[in-house]
A protein has these predicted regions:
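Charged, gly/pro-rich active-site loop segments
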Residues: 110-112, 120-133
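Intrinsically disordered, low-complexity linker/loop segments enriched in Gly/Pro
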Residues: 123, 143-145
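Extended, Lys/Arg-enriched charged tracts that mediate electrostatic binding to polyanionic substrates
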Residues: 129-139, 143
Length: 361
């Protein structure tokens, strides 16, 4: 189906960042956003591109009280020929469908989603950065804004997309990769079996902020979550999936518990490693096994994967107050190769022999 969304241009364009090497993450927002409404009996309607600006919301809107919402995260990349492309949007669409089903949010057709992304990117195409390590972060989200205190699915929703030119999530001084410190604790959990861990919903992240604040006390950037049942098996790192290279095996937590977000970068990492002949296992891994591997020298690398950072190498863990160093604390070869390959594919500087990129403009 072909969609033609009306565009209302801003009359007060913002100054674009002067130095693309200092964008940071989500510090700037573009001139426009996409908005679309849903009403029960009518479906999705009135999609439009409008100026990015504050909007009114009724204080009794159900999202403010019962958190019926979802979001996605993706990036648009400037290619060497000046075009703009995105990475594996089919995976975002599938994950969005799973989240919507879990949260009782109406289905959003995949072709509509892609058309909306293209429309808002086209409106702000001059904002897409081109400096190394940069991209346009795309944040689609849906929330129920029916005015009601009833604990029931809303009958009215808004679908919106906002854009933010962004740099590297964890960048070294030269703009390349650097290692981070990660905190491991067994007091709080991210998700439990039967919950919303596999869905991309705000509550999963809001509920993790207490542990993230505790991590800062140990000079750590983020939290490595353990499982809810036994508090011993590694799951995710903050907003990312976690990988551990022990001896000749790369290990990541399995998805069958329903507590792990099925990351698009995670799937890409697994496929690339298998293509390169690296042994990859999706299995349970205890934090005790990780610590033991560090002591006997078999722990080669730990890294996180996600849309924001692509690949984020981990140099140290703080495990319940005790520091555990990963090899020599520097970026490992597998993490570096994965980053170079994935970011190269995303920006068009490395041939995409996997068919993962999607040209927008």
């Amino acid at each position: 189906m072909e969609y033609n969304f009306p565009v209302t241009r801003t009359t007060h364009p913002k100054p674009r960042p002067a130095d693309e090497t200092k964008l940071g993450f989500a510090k700037y927002f573009t001139d426009h956003m996409f908005v679309m409404d849903y009403d029960e009996g009518q479906g999705w309607h009135d999609g439009r591109v409008v100026p990015h600006e504050p909007f009114l919301i009724e204080p009794a809107s159900c999202v403010l009280h019962y958190a019926q919402m979802m979001f996605e995260g993706m990036k648009a990349y400037r290619t060497p020929d000046g075009g703009v492309q995105i990475f594996r949007p089919d995976m975002n669409i599938k994950r969005m469908a799973r989240t919507n089903e879990r949260m009782c949010i109406p289905e959003l057709p995949g072709d509509l989603f892609l058309a909306a992304v293209k429309a808002v990117i086209e409106a702000d195409r001059d904002w897409v950065p081109s400096a190394p390590g940069t991209a346009m972060y795309i944040r689609p989200f849906i929330f129920g804004d029916e005015v009601s205190f009833s604990v029931l699915p809303a009958k009215h929703y808004k679908f919106m997309i906002i854009l933010s030119p962004t740099g590297s999530y964890y960048a070294a001084n030269d703009g390349g990769l650097s290692t981070t410190r990660i905190y491991v604790q067994d007091k709080y959990i991210r998700a439990a079996h039967g919950g919303t861990g596999y869905a991309k919903v705000g509550g999963n992240y809001g509920g993790g902020m207490r542990a993230s604040q505790d991590a800062m006390k140990y000079n750590c950037k983020d939290v490595l979550w353990l499982d809810a049942a036994e508090h011993k098996y590694v799951e995710e790192i903050g907003t990312s999936n976690a990988f551990f290279r022990i001896a000749d095996e790369v290990i990541t937590a399995p998805l069958d518990s329903g507590t792990i977000l099925p990351g698009i970068t995670r799937d890409s990492v697994i496929q690339l490693l298998k293509k390169w002949g690296v042994k990859v296992s999706e299995r349970k891994l205890s934090i005790d096994e990780v610590v033991a591997a560090s002591k006997d020298g078999s722990l080669q690398e730990i890294f996180a994967s996600g849309t924001a950072a692509v690949i984020s190498p981990i140099g140290w863990l703080n495990v319940m107050g005790t520091d555990v160093q990963v090899e020599d604390g520097t970026v490992g070869p597998v993490a570096q190769k994965l980053y170079d390959t994935l970011y190269g594919m995303q920006t068009g500087t490395v041939a995409d022999d996997m068919g993962w990129t999607y040209r927008l403009l």
